[in-house]
Amino acid sequence: GVQASSPAKFDTMRDKTIIINGFSKAFAMTGWRIGYVITPEEWFEPLYLHTGHQVSGMADFIIEACTVALNDEPKYGTIEKMRAEFDERRKFLVKEINSMKHFSCLNPVGAFYIFMNIKKSGMTADEFCAYAIDKYRLATIPGTAFGRNGEGYVRLSYASSMEVLQKAISILHQIDQEL
């Protein structure tokens, strides 16, 4: 993937930058919907007054889990291990998909999704998704769910085990051969 750069790393921008981030992806806490804000001190109160009632009231166990994650990250390198695993899965899917006759994809650089081109299959995105789920129990998301320019594409997630991804690729190879 690509390493993002924060404006806060520049001395002239540090006091003008608000950083908003979450724990869901970095620490695999999907669904807990907890995040944090790093802001210059003078912006804290207005920001809190504006959003405090909308985003407060998190369960104690979630706060404790986030505290442990932050404190243990330097010791265990959890984020780097997960990043390396996702990178391995991404490379596997991109290589396999691009080896097929009817499917292709670009190398994603900012998420754990593949936007697979299915135009050579002769199916619409909705038709492909229905076929994959009905015949093979393979769940995909039609690209049209992300806008009209998504026609001819389906989204695949690689936020799963390598074993599950290998099975998905096996199914995609079968579909590719059937076309």
Language-model regions, residue ranges each:
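PLP-dependent class I/II
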Residues: 1-179
